[in-house]
Every structure is written in structure tokens, then in C-alpha cells.
């Protein structure tokens, strides 16, 4: 098979107003990673080995949007646009008629709002069309959800999915055959159904789930998610607290990473003195550019007297979520002569990972001594270093 024996044009339909998307601008011009949906779609076809010409059917009122969308495209495969009509069928018809001078052997029809079409899918369509000499070939995916007939918000009956397929674009056809069919009717929402209506044989090949159409706001948000590169932020935190004698009648323990550890000394602090959580909170706030723990919970305020430090950790985690970030991983180094930390590491990891809503494998806790050097070496206190990596959240807004 040699596809280059054939002239192949792509007609991208971009004349719709996108009323279902509830957007202030037509959805084909919404930005994904700084470029319009239409730009991304055009680039897919410009890169394909079989496509010789590309024509875009646009809305007459969207000309300024279109010019901005293609301003960075210099490839001569992209022809001047044609104005579309009142509906999809009339836009396709006008687009086909504009290609008559070129007179391609085959035409590939594609929705502008399917920017995830792959090069492989375009290749498969063209090669199937040429190898098997079909009138048309379209991609289709199996219907996996239960299908029902509905009336007045109630299910009337359930439809068997066995023979059901969801038809996608791009769709490839014999150019003259498709043009003839369009010139004989007024309105069809899909080119393959138009051809079938005219008793033409249209074959299907396996489509791609990733080649979904951007129809609703939810689709747009999903597309933004897929196009957007994840963003990362790094933060470092440090805290140190002094050991003091246990007051008469008080429990003999300290708290580290939310875990009570028996010790013959107490920690001098305004809150509960969880030095590790304080370092973690500072690391998260630092990564977010939100100052430090003292700015949000000043030790001069009686409100935070003896406060459970888990409150501070919850605050930092919530602040990260508000800014669109989650903790990717956390590394903690506890420096003290006593108490021994190793017996409590598993419990500490569980506490911190639960508070941050991450798997405990992403929390690492190390402990070391100061080798009898300095104030920590003299067992006068405890210090903690914390490093955190944040990543952008992957969820639909």
C-alpha cells in the first residue's frame, strides 16, 4: 500500500458555538497549556504523514479567535478557512465544496474539539481505507456502561450493549461520494450516518477512549488536567526545643510525630512541643510560600497554649489543598541523644501519613545523635529537619 498515490485532505469542523459547555468563549478556542483546543487539534493533523491539506470550517463570528489560534502555525498544509453554516452538516458541506478545486481522493472529517486524536489512529484509518477500498471508515469504541431508554426521568427499558458502539471522529471517506451525499440532504449530525442513510458501506476500526470530545465543562477540566504539566514545590523546615525537668505530678513523656514517647524530661514549648510536626508544618508552609508556623500560630497568643500540634499539621495540609497541592513525599531527620526513636518509627509514619492523606511509604523518618557534641550532644534538647516535595493535585474542579 502506498498512501502517497492518493491526495488526502482533512476537514476540521470548528464552527460550533459550544452552548453545552457554558463557557464565555467557544470551546474550540479555550486554552489548554497556553494554546487553544483548535491549535492542538490542527497540530495533530499537520504532523501526520498521510495528510496533504487541512481546511478548517469556522464560524463567521469567530474569525478573530481563529486568527489568534493559528498565529504560530506556518505549515502550508493549513489552507485558508471556510465559513461554516447554521449546523454541523451545512458546515461540513461548505467545507467539502471548498475542497473541490483540490479534488482529493479521500477526506478526513474531524471535530475540532477532539484534540487527543493520535497519529496512530489517523494512520489506521487511512491505511484501512486504502487497503480494503471502503467507501468510509470510522473509529468506534465499545459501550461499557449500561444503556437504557428513559422517559420523564424514569427508565423504560435496558438496551443490550452487544452491538452498540460509540462512533468517534476522525472519519475518512471517498471525497466525491461524501460530497454527493451532503449535497442531497439538509441536516445530519454525523457523516457516517449520512453515508449509511445513502446505502454506502462504512466500516469501523477500533477507536481510542482517550480521543474523547470536549462537550461539557467537565470535559474541558479533564482536558486541562491531561495537558497540564504537573508542578512541584520543595520546602525545608527546622525546629528545636529545649528539654526541661518534668513538673511534679505531670506525665513523663514527650510527643514526636504525634506519638507519645516515655522520657525522663519534658519539652519546653508554648504548644504541646511536637518538634517534628512543627518542622513538617514549616516545610509545607515554606513550599507554599506561606511564611512559617509562628506567623499563623504565634507563641504570644494564649489561644495556642498547650495546643495539640496535629491542629497545625491539619492547617498546613488544608492550606496546600487550597492552593492545589498535595504532599508527594516527606523526609524527616530527628536529632537527639535520647530518647531512642527507632521503636516508634512505624507508629510515627502512620500518624503523619494519615494526617497528610498519603501512603506511609512516602513518609521517611530517620534518627541520629549529635555524637555528644553541642547542646544536643549534652542532651539539652531535640531538633528536627524536614524536607517536603509537593505536587499539583490531580482532580476535576
From Swiss-Prot:
* Sites marked Positions MEP for the nucleophilic attack: 161, 213
- Recorded superkingdom: Bacteria
Identify the stretch(es) annotated as 2-C-methyl-D-erythritol 4-phosphate cytidylyltransferase.
Answer: 1-233
UniProt keyword annotation of Oxidoreductase present: no
Q: Does the keyword Nucleotidyltransferase apply?
A: yes
Q: Where is this region: 2-C-methyl-D-erythritol 2,4-cyclodiphosphate synthase?
A: 233-397
Kindly give the Pfam families that the UniProt entry links to this protein. IspD, YgbB
As recorded in UniProt, its EC number(s) are: 2.7.7.60, 4.6.1.12
Which keywords accompany this UniProt record?
A: Isoprene biosynthesis, Lyase, Metal-binding, Multifunctional enzyme, Nucleotidyltransferase, Transferase
Q: Where is this site: Transition state stabilizer?
A: 20, 27, 270, 369
UniProt binding sites for a divalent metal cation: 239, 241, 278
Instruction: Name the chemical reaction catalysed here.
Output: 2-C-methyl-D-erythritol 4-phosphate + CTP + H(+) = 4-CDP-2-C-methyl-D-erythritol + diphosphate; 4-CDP-2-C-methyl-D-erythritol 2-phosphate = 2-C-methyl-D-erythritol 2,4-cyclic diphosphate + CMP
Pathway-wise, it operates in: Isoprenoid biosynthesis; isopentenyl diphosphate biosynthesis via DXP pathway; isopentenyl diphosphate from 1-deoxy-D-xylulose 5-phosphate: step 2/6; Isoprenoid biosynthesis; isopentenyl diphosphate biosynthesis via DXP pathway; isopentenyl diphosphate from 1-deoxy-D-xylulose 5-phosphate: step 4/6
Spans through the membrane: none
Q: Which InterPro entries match?
A: IspD, IspD/F, IspD/TarI, MECDP_synthase, MECDP_synthase_CS, MECDP_synthase_sf, Nucleotide-diphossugar_trans
GO function term, MF aspect, one = 2-C-methyl-D-erythritol 4-phosphate cytidylyltransferase activity
Enumerate the residues binding 4-CDP-2-C-methyl-D-erythritol 2-phosphate.
239-241, 270-271, 292-294, 368-371, 375, 378
Instruction: State any GO BP term from the record.
Output: isopentenyl diphosphate biosynthetic process, methylerythritol 4-phosphate pathway
Protein role: Bifunctional enzyme that catalyzes the formation of 4-diphosphocytidyl-2-C-methyl-D-erythritol from CTP and 2-C-methyl-D-erythritol 4-phosphate (MEP) (IspD), and catalyzes the conversion of 4-diphosphocytidyl-2-C-methyl-D-erythritol 2-phosphate (CDP-ME2P) to 2-C-methyl-D-erythritol 2,4-cyclodiphosphate (ME-CPP) with a corresponding release of cytidine 5-monophosphate (CMP) (IspF).
Q: Its family?
A: In the N-terminal section; belongs to the IspD/TarI cytidylyltransferase family. IspD subfamily. In the C-terminal section; belongs to the IspF family.
Protein name (Swiss-Prot/TrEMBL) = Bifunctional enzyme IspD/IspF
What organism does the record attribute this protein to? Wolbachia pipientis wMel
Amino acid at each position: 500500500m502506498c498512501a502517497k498515490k492518493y491526495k488526502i485532505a482533512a476537514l476540521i469542523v470548528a464552527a460550533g458555538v459550544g452552548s453545552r459547555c457554558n463557557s464565555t468563549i467557544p470551546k474550540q478556542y479555550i486554552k489548554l497549556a497556553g494554546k487553544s483546543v483548535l491549535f492542538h487539534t490542527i497540530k495533530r493533523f499537520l504532523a501526520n504523514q498521510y495528510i496533504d491539506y487541512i481546511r478548517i470550517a469556522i464560524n463567521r463570528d469567530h474569525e478573530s479567535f481563529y486568527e489568534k489560534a493559528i498565529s504560530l502555525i506556518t505549515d502550508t498544509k493549513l489552507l485558508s478557512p471556510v465559513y461554516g453554516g447554521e449546523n454541523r452538516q451545512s458546515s461540513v458541506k461548505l467545507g467539502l465544496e471548498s475542497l473541490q478545486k483540490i479534488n482529493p481522493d479521500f477526506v478526513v472529517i474531524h471535530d475540532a474539539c477532539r484534540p487527543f486524536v493520535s497519529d496512530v489512529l489517523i494512520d489506521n484509518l487511512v491505511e484501512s481505507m486504502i487497503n480494503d477500498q471502503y467507501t468510509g471508515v470510522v473509529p468506534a469504541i465499545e459501550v461499557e456502561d449500561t444503556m437504557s431508554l428513559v422517559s420523564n426521568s424514569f427508565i423504560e427499558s435496558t438496551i443490550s450493549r452487544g452491538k452498540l458502539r460509540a462512533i468517534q471522529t476522525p472519519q475518512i471517506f471517498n471525497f466525491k461520494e461524501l460530497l454527493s451525499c451532503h449535497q442531497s440532504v439538509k441536516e445530519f449530525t454525523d457523516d457516517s450516518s449520512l453515508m449509511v442513510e445513502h446505502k454506502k458501506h462504512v466500516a469501523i476500526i477500533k477507536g481510542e477512549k482517550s480521543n474523547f470530545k470536549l462537550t461539557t465543562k467537565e470535559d474541558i477540566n479533564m482536558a486541562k488536567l491531561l495537558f497540564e504539566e504537573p508542578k512541584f514545590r520543595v520546602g525545608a523546615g527546622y525546629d528545636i526545643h529545649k528539654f526541661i525537668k518534668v513538673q511534679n505530678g505531670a506525665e513523663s513523656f514527650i510527643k514526636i510525630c504525634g506519638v507519645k514517647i516515655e522520657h525522663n524530661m519534658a519539652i519546653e514549648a508554648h504548644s504541646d512541643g511536637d518538634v517534628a510536626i512543627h518542622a513538617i508544618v514549616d516545610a509545607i508552609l515554606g513550599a507554599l510560600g506561606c511564611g512559617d508556623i509562628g506567623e499563623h500560630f504565634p507563641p504570644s497568643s494564649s489561644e495556642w497554649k498547650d495546643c495539640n500540634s496535629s491542629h497545625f499539621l491539619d492547617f498546613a495540609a488544608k492550606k496546600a489543598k487550597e492552593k492545589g497541592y498535595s504532599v508527594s513525599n516527606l523526609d524527616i531527620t530527628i536529632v537527639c541523644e535520647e530518647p531512642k526513636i527507632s521503636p516508634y518509627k512505624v507508629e510515627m509514619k502512620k500518624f503523619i501519613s494519615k494526617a497528610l492523606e498519603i501512603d506511609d511509604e512516602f513518609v521517611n523518618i530517620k534518627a541520629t545523635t549529635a555524637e555528644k557534641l553541642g547542646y544536643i550532644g549534652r542532651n539539652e534538647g531535640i531538633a528536627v529537619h524536614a524536607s517536603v516535595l509537593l505536587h499539583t493535585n490531580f482532580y476535576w474542579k
